[in-house]
Amino acid sequence: NHGFFSFEVKAPVFVARHLVKHEYLIMSEYSRRYITDDVEFYTPDVWRKAAADVKQGSSDEGVEGYESIFDFEDISGDVYSNNQDCVDLYNHMVNSGVAPEQARMVLPQSLMTSWTWSGTLGAFANMCKLRLSKDTQYETRLVAQGVYTELKKQFPIAAPLLVEGVL
């Protein structure tokens, strides 16, 4: 339970905000205030339908007509255009002298962000226990699966027992 881990994670902002809520895990995000790398956005491979049985969440079923990120005639093209418009506005603001810490407010939630995430085996196991469930957003579940894979490599007996709630 006292094993310590640090992970370098890259995910969309909306996933980072979902995961930052976990107790006893320290997240140090790389800020656009100090980083001038090109921005990168997340676009899903499939636009999922809203789940019929919960207020939030999605089903495993794709929305007809929106299956491909390359279907620029439909919603994916609109998302791509919106992201580009936001980047153009961000760059214009920075090039006009606006501080990057303020200009970044125009960037969308699909912006990819990176962070160092540190905590104990117990804290990460608790996060995995909650975020590996079927009702967790798919993109968040992917991060939890990556963390769980690493936990099992280091603690092949304890990690599954902690995640399953046996320990």
Q: What label would you give each PLM region?
A:
Residues 1-167:
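Family-specific signature for flavin-dependent thymidylate synthase
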